[in-house]
UniProtKB/Swiss-Prot annotation:
Organism: Homo sapiens
GO biological process: positive regulation of transcription by RNA polymerase II; protein sumoylation
PROSITE patterns hit by this protein: UBIQUITIN_2
Keywords of the record: Coiled coil, Cytoplasm, Isopeptide bond, Methylation, Nucleus, Phosphoprotein, Ubl conjugation
SUPFAM superfamilies documented for this protein: Ubiquitin-like
Modified sites of kind Phosphoserine: S54, S84, S88, S90, S92, S127, S198, S201, S204, S220, S314, S369, S390
Protein's job: In T-helper 2 (Th2) cells, regulates the magnitude of NFAT-driven transcription of a specific subset of cytokine genes, including IL3, IL4, IL5 and IL13, but not IL2. Recruits PRMT1 to the IL4 promoter; this leads to enhancement of histone H4 'Arg-3'-methylation and facilitates subsequent histone acetylation at the IL4 locus, thus promotes robust cytokine expression. Down-regulates formation of poly-SUMO chains by UBE2I/UBC9.
UniProt signal peptide: none
Compositional bias per record (Basic and acidic residues), positions renumbered to this chain: 180-192
Post-translational changes noted in the entry: Methylation at the N-terminus by PRMT1 modulates interaction with the NFAT complex and results in augmented cytokine production.
Record's subcellular location: Nucleus; Cytoplasm
Protein name: NFATC2-interacting protein
Length: 419
């Protein structure tokens, strides 16, 4: 049976020199490339499986067959029974080019793009505006060197002293704080590792002393700023007061004791149709009221009777003991003369007034008795025995030998005493 002539097309070179070439190898292998003509360059279709990281693709790569081809020839398959030529009536050209044996597994290779650093293209990440406003920091330079911890401490001091205004920007930004905290955490980790390696070694006191001194320094600076602020706000004292304050300090324990002015109580006295107001101290006895009303009415004080409601008041009582108020009114009654009073009409009621207001004494004396009796009685009553006293009546000094009848004395007359 004659072999069918293969179709010549665009890839006709891939079919070899014809069907008869296959019998020379005793199988379906291709003719060795050494037998091909070096002057004739042909194209063959080789199935190469390029596997990428994402998915698998099978690409057909056209390779030039020639004398300089570096692709090695696949080892020939073992000889086998030649397929019948009659069955290739309607097969495609692929069957002529490919053996009819079991399908070969495609060569799987991974696509790897290896470029030199000089061949890699440089693509700008940021635009021109971003680059102009962005200051990049070199990789070999630490961020904390650009921003020392002193700036953060000054910012904390400014916040604590309140010197920054509300509208002014804060001296520290959040990313600086994050970087510093990150650096501190790394330092703490290294310290913890050192402590784990040497558990018996106590912590160095240098860190404690540094923090203590730093805190003291901050406190002193804050106090200094507060003092400066206080000096600016407080008025400047006069120079004389400042020198006096530097020399000595005067502490006023208590203020000067002012003399207490007696509180006068306006006592209302009703006599017949008249209402008399007499200023009186709360601790003063009512005897002064009796004397004032006897003088006002022209009668003997023994005839004056004071009543509060229906209660007779004693001359020794005081407004405080009686609990009298401003609205209370005392009644004054003048007693009539009795027959006993006519019998004792020879007795004179003389008033003796000393230098002080409270040194007042009323003495009963007959008209025929010398005034020496009155003088001795007054000295004993006032406790002035042994003192030199002078008694005057109407401007005349009394010697004590005078009689009241000789001087024309009457009841209620006043004798003055001077020491």
């Amino acid at each position: 049976m004659a072999e069918p002539v293969g179709k010549r097309g665009r890839w006709s070179g891939g079919s070899g020199a014809g069907r008869g070439g296959r019998g020379g190898w005793g199988g379906r292998g291709r003719r060795p490339r050494a037998q091909r003509s070096p002057s004739r360059g042909t194209l063959d279709v080789v199935s190469v499986d390029l596997v990428t990281d994402s998915d698998e693709e099978i690409l057909e790569v056209a390779t030039a067959r020639g004398a300089a081809d570096e692709v090695e020839v696949e080892p020939p398959e073992p000889p086998g029974p030649v397929a019948s030529r009659d069955n290739s009536n309607s097969d495609s050209e692929g069957e002529d080019r490919r053996p009819a044996g079991p399908p070969r597994e495609p060569v799987r290779r991974r696509r790897r793009l290896v470029l030199d650093p000089g061949e890699a293209p440089l693509v700008p990440v940021y635009s021109g505006k971003v680059k102009s406003s962005l200051r990049l920091i070199p990789d070999d330079l630490s961020l904390l060197k650009l921003y020392p911890p002193g700036d953060e401490e000054e910012a904390e001091l400014a916040d604590s002293s309140g010197l920054y205004h509300e509208g002014s920007p804060s001296p520290g930004s959040p990313w600086k704080t994050k970087l510093r905290t990150k650096d501190k955490e790394e330092k703490k980790k290294t310290e913890f590792l050192d402590l784990d390696n040497s558990p018996l070694s106590p912590p160095s006191p240098r860190t404690k002393s540094r923090t203590h001194t730093r805190a003291l320094k901050k406190l002193s600076e804050v106090n200094k700023r507060l003092q400066d602020l206080r000096s600016c706000l407080s008025p400047k004292p006069p120079q004389g007061q400042e020198q006096q304050g530097q020399e000595d300090e005067v502490v006023l324990v208590e203020g000067p004791t002012l003399p207490e002015t007696p509180r006068l109580f306006p006592l209302k006295i009703r006599c017949r149709a008249d209402l008399v107001r007499l200023p009186l101290r709360m601790s003063e006895p009512l005897q002064s009221v009796v004397d004032h009303m006897a003088t006002h009415l022209g009668v003997s004080p023994s005839r004056i009777l004071l009543l509060f409601g229906e209660t007779e008041l004693s001359p020794t009582a005081t407004p405080r003991t009686l609990k009298l108020g401003v609205a209370d009114i005392i009644d004054c009654v003048v007693l009539t003369s009795s027959p006993e009073a006519t019998e004792t009409s020879q007795q004179l009621q003389l008033r003796v007034q000393g230098k002080e207001k409270h040194q007042t004494l009323e003495v009963s004396l007959s008209r025929d008795s010398p005034l020496k009796t009155l003088m001795s009685h007054y000295e004993e009553a006032m406790g002035l025995s042994g003192r030199k006293l002078s008694f005057f009546f109407d401007g005349t000094k009394l010697s004590g030998r005078e009689l009241p009848a000789d001087l024309g004395m009457e009841s209620g007359d006043l004798i003055e005493v001077w020491g």
